[in-house]
Swiss-Prot record:
GO CC annotation, single: cytosolic large ribosomal subunit
Subunit structure: Part of the 50S ribosomal subunit. Forms a cluster with proteins L14 and L19.
Pfam families: Ribosomal_L3
NCBIfam families named among the record's database cross-references: L3_bact
MF terms in GO: rRNA binding; structural constituent of ribosome
Region (Disordered): 127-152
Keyword set includes Cell division: no
Role this protein plays: One of the primary rRNA binding proteins, it binds directly near the 3'-end of the 23S rRNA, where it nucleates assembly of the 50S subunit.
Family: Belongs to the universal ribosomal protein uL3 family.
Keywords for the protein's UniProt record, in alphabetical order: Ribonucleoprotein, Ribosomal protein, RNA-binding, rRNA-binding
Name this protein carries in UniProt: Large ribosomal subunit protein uL3
Amino acid sequence: MLGLIGKKVGMTQVFQGNGVVVPVTVIEFEPNYIIGKKTVERDGYDALIMGSVDLKSSKISKPIKGQYKNLENVEPKKYVIEFKGLKGYDAGDEVGLDAFKEIKYVDITGTTKGKGFQGAMKRHNFSGGPSSHGSKFHRHLGSTGQAATPSRTFKGTKMAGRMGGEQQTIQNLEVVFIDEEKRAILVKGAVPGVKGSFVIVKKAKKVGV
């Protein structure tokens, strides 16, 4: 499935021809290069390995150098992603925004904002206890288990804990505008992650669902 590695710049708004305001997220793309291929004969499936953003020289180890020794004019990359089912490219090729020209909707994967340790009301949208006088708890979790049977708290019970910092995919975001000169696209709505975080933009898997 076709995709690119981009950077979330932030949100803004644009006006459509009829005057309707549309909130959009700006995603910027540095050059994306094909740095490797997988084939059915050798690996059991077809895929392209794509990289973006040059790695700092202090971070380049000998094993990493070895992976790029057969690629001309392609520096080791910081972000490396595998896209399955893609053909038609060779190692060293650059994939640009023209890949999205005919695409109306995209799926975007990013890492959500980290919120730190949060209570059950914020983390799981619990309603909490009564706020009135005489109540013994207001924002506490409450009971997490049963009586003598089974006499324990089950794994996976919703509790307070670390919130955010997880991979999340938003599907069917409309591509509002493609700016090839600035190597950026505008998509309708919000995208997971903080400003400056890197995201994976793919052709929508379930358009119109």
